[in-house]
Amino acid sequence: IRRPPRSTPLYSSAASDVYKRQIIDSAGALDKKRLVRNVVHQPCIFEYVYFSRPDSTLDEISVHKSRLRMGDFLGDKILNEYKNIDVDVVIPVPDTSRTSAMQVAYKLGVKYREGFMKNRYIGRTFIMQGQNTRKKSVAQKLNPIEIEFKNKNVLLVDDSIVRGHTSKKIIQMVRKHGAKKVYFASASPPIRYQNVFGIDMPATKELVAHNRTIRQIKNYIGADELIYQDLESLRLSASIGNPKITEYEDSVFTGNYCDSYVTKDYLNNLEKRRKDVSR
């Protein structure tokens, strides 16, 4: 069987979203028969934060524009609540955070720079098994460009912070390359709870924000200051694009799961299965 190389594009045109209670049959037709009871449509907010490509449109919401708005809200929060920090340059942790980071720099009126070379043969570190593997992979995945960090107060912007190991390692690398101060901003709120709807996220106890304050997280990752996006601002970043959607699946931030089968026993069993035995 001959397959096209991975870089070969599959051209398509946007048609519509496939919603709950809908399927596409083998002939390519959209079947709108009622398959399950009527439920409130709650898109996963993490799609807009991280998983979806920026050129995607989900539920009539542009992922790119939603990330621009995340940067707007994050920049406003820094200006209003963190007036003590003096930022020389904003640098994204590639790749997903680029859009938000550019908007943060615009809001703050400072330079935006690319500060990392990325090895694209290393996968997503937050789903890798084993802390040693993750630490090694971060060092292999990102290589700092020293001239962008040396003798500067740097604001690093990432889409989210999961275990905190990646953020901690990146901050250490940046300091090693001469940064005077390292501030860290997350385009999403603290991730405090595990995901049960398809994202292979760590067990709750492995999440850096679980049972930690913002100050404790800041100290753990070694940042001079840590700024998180507010949950309401994140929701607005998406809902401005489609006001018809009023609820989102945001349980990783709130612990409020939208299905009744997600009980405490279910979560405990899931925790056991996901426990990272390689640590």
Report residues per predicted region.
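PRPP-associated nucleotide enzymes
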Residues: 13-279
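Single conserved hydrophobic/aromatic residue that forms the stacking wall/gate
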Residues: 1-15, 19
